[in-house]
Amino acid sequence: MAKYEILYIIRPNIEEEAKNALVARFDSILTDNGATVVESKDWEKRRLAYEIQDFREGIYHVVNVEANDATALNEFDRLSKINGDILRHMIVKLDA
């Protein structure tokens, strides 16, 4: 299984319950499509280098994933692009 790290930035004015639901939803998207979530944690609320959608801060969330193929990652990528609560995301394949 290949190991991946996903980092996404959540808008800072989201309520705690909505943020937890968003994280749970995107973790389940990964697991429903065949990936294994090793770790999913909030990093911290940080100032952004530049404004994204009129926000100067964002809540960083990191997910470590193991997957056999890119199906789960492609679905995560597709859905995170159309979700208004996620400002940016990045998927990186980790070295073995």
Curated annotation (Swiss-Prot):
Alphabetical keyword list: Ribonucleoprotein, Ribosomal protein, RNA-binding, rRNA-binding
GO CC field: cytoplasm; ribonucleoprotein complex; ribosome
GO BP field: translation
GO molecular function: small ribosomal subunit rRNA binding; structural constituent of ribosome
Pfam families reported for this sequence: Ribosomal_S6
InterPro entries: Ribosomal_bS6, Ribosomal_bS6_sf, Ribosomal_S6_plastid/chlpt, Transl_elong_EF1B/ribsomal_bS6
Classification via HAMAP family: Ribosomal_bS6 (MF_00360)
Family membership: Belongs to the bacterial ribosomal protein bS6 family.
Name listed for the protein in its UniProt record: Small ribosomal subunit protein bS6
